[in-house]
């Protein structure tokens, strides 16, 4: 976000703030992130796109720029969010994927993880899975789907919902990994949700 604001401020010669559809925790990479910004004057979208991609770092790319109504807000208008968490299960760590997946280095009981995940789908108070103990706002969220896919050397957990708390996906994933390691019972998710304390969930 800071890099985008820096380049836009340089282009417009004004202090610019953007609103993203969602924040990303440390170590999280955004794909197809939507952001909105109010500019004082009318700019050609193609000119903005070209300028930003010319001056942004190589690991950030703006795919498209479109004019929207004055009322549009990327975060408030977001219909849903999707997180994909990759877990490496092969013994040897991949040097090419080290920034994009968590290396566990062991096989997991995926069927047990899927059973546990079913109890997390729906509208619940996810306070147990919130990384911010001082959270004052509601910790109720809706997860519409959790898909767990297994390939030869990787497990991918895809969470879809209306929004996620700070570190919620990491904590959910850490908990499901413990289920896959048989360190936690697959049927324990309802009890965990009722606990309302972070210390009872998995490590991250």
Predicted feature residues:
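Structured-RNA-binding interfaces characteristic of tRNA pseudouridine synthases
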Residues: 1-204
């Amino acid at each position: 976000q800071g890099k985008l604001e820096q380049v836009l401020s340089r282009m417009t010669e004004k202090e610019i703030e953007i609103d993203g559809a969602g924040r990303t925790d440390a170590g999280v990479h955004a794909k197809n992130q939507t952001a909105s910004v109010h500019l004082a004057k009318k700019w050609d979208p193609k000119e903005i796109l070209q300028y930003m991609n010319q001056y942004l770092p190589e690991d950030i790319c703006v795919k498209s720029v479109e004019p929207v109504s004055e009322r549009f807000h990327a975060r408030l208008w977001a219909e849903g969010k999707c997180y994909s968490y990759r877990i490496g299960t092969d013994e040897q760590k991949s040097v090419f994927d080290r920034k994009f997946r968590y290396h566990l280095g062991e096989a997991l009981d995926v069927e047990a993880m899927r059973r546990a995940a079913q109890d997390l789908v729906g509208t619940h108070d996810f306070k147990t899975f919130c990384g911010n103990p001082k959270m004052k706002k509601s910790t109720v969220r809706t997860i519409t789907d959790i898909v767990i896919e297994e390939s030869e050397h990787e497990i991918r957990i895809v969470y879809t919902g209306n929004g996620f708390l700070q570190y919620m996906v990491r904590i959910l994933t850490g908990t499901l990994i413990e289920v896959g390691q048989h360190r936690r019972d697959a049927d324990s998710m309802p009890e965990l949700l009722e606990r309302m304390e972070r210390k009872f969930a998995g490590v991250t």
